[in-house]
């Protein structure tokens, strides 16, 4: 597991705060350390008076966020770990939704599971033509657990949202926009 300081890059350009999830070898999958770092980094930029807009992106060109880090989740057996795993993502997603600054997702590749749920929390999305979005948890027998089903239905045509949730299929950037 990477150290929190290694997994999240914070930069500022003029009045733009940029959060880069920095785990390209794992397709920027969200383990507990990354979730903790994301909570802290987002709060830092959200409370910075010099930052007027926040951009969230993923390192590398293959993935924005490929979802939760299943290897990390499965490496721990205690119920408290599962609760921490879920609580952290709910904290940051809710904070993104209620932020008084515009939050932009710059989706540069795969956005699966928690990655799709993360971009659904943002105000504006810029999605690369090669990006794929989806909620594949259903193929593992899991319902998306970070509010993605509720956000997707509010933001997409109901039939498209149901298709994604029931099949676990992926959609292209062109279909998503």
List PLM regions with ranges.
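Conserved CoA-thioester-binding segment of acyl-CoA-metabolizing enzymes
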Residues: 1-57, 94
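Crotonase-fold acyl-CoA enzyme core
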Residues: 2, 95-177
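Glycine-centered loop/turn positions within well-structured domains
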Residues: 25, 62, 71, 150, ...
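Phosphate-coordinating loops and pocket residues in cytosolic domains that bind phosphorylated ligands
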Residues: 29-32, 66, 75, 154, ...
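Glycine- (often His-adjacent) and acidic-residue-rich active-site loop
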Residues: 58-95, 111, 141
């Amino acid at each position: 597991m990477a150290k929190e300081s290694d997994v999240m890059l914070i930069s500022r350009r003029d009045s733009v705060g940029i959060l880069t999830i920095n785990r390209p070898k794992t397709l920027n999958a969200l383990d507990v350390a990354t979730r903790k770092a994301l909570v802290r980094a987002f709060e830092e930029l959200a409370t910075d008076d010099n930052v007027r807009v926040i951009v969230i992106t993923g390192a590398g060109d293959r993935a924005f966020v490929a979802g939760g880090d299943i290897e990390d989740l499965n490496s721990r057996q205690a119920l408290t770990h599962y609760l921490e795993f879920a609580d952290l993502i709910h904290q940051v997603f809710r904070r993104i939704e209620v932020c008084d600054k515009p939050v932009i997702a710059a989706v540069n590749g795969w956005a699966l599971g928690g990655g799709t749920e993360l971009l659904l929390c943002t105000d504006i999305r810029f999605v690369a033509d090669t990006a794929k979005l989806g909620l594949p948890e259903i193929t593992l027998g899991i319902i998306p657990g970070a509010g993605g089903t509720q956000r997707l239905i509010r933001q997409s045509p109901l039939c498209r949202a149901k298709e994604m949730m029931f099949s676990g299929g992926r959609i292209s950037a062109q279909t998503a926009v």
